[in-house]
Amino acid sequence: HDGIVANPNCCTIPLTCVLKPLHEEAGLARVRLATYQSVSGAGARAMERLRGEAPADHDLRMDWDFDGDEFDEEAKLRAETRKIMELPELPIQATCVRVPVLVGHAEAVWLETEEPLAPERARELLASAPSVRVEDFPSPGKAAGIDEVLVGRIRRDPTIENGLALFLASDNLRKGAALNAIQITELLLSRERAAA
């Protein structure tokens, strides 16, 4: 609808923050990822249930709609990433799971670039990317309560040509929702002022 802006999925936002500078440098050819999503993404009831159980006993409900092949969360991640990155044909395969963590989503990402991209160069690009912080070992616990997407474990993926592997974590209630909505509003207001 004209005049309505949709806030992307809480896993799409951190993923695209990390993919964008890598794509601008070397072009993306393919992306595969697994998400490890905290129970806060399923709501307050899920958080209360986790608080009352030992994590080992927690029933990891996959609370997304399933079409027989994939969860709608996986399809949404693919569609939104393609749209945001302006790469409508980009091959993306995602597997999404819910984990017994209160706040913070994590993603293991394997990507293939069109041009060679050394892990050291990827680290440099990500270290200077907006809303991204390079950490040796990102985790949902480290990401909880902060605005940046934490990314680390950046290394060559020897199973494919021009392959990189990395791990990221973000606060799904901040960067994945509220903060991102504020940043979108600020961007729209700055564009409006510039046009006036």
Where are these regions (language model features)?
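A glycine-rich, Thr/Ser-enriched phosphate-binding loop motif common to dinucleotide/cofactor-binding enzymes
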Residues: 3-14, 69-75, 173-180
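Conserved short-loop catalytic and cofactor-binding motifs
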Residues: 6, 65, 169
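Conserved residues at beta->alpha junctions
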Residues: 9, 113, 168, 172
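Predominant activation on well-ordered alpha-helical scaffold segments within soluble catalytic domains
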Residues: 16-23, 78-82, 123, 152, ...
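C-terminal substrate-binding/catalytic lobe of Rossmann-fold NAD(P)-dependent oxidoreductases
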Residues: 30-35, 39-166
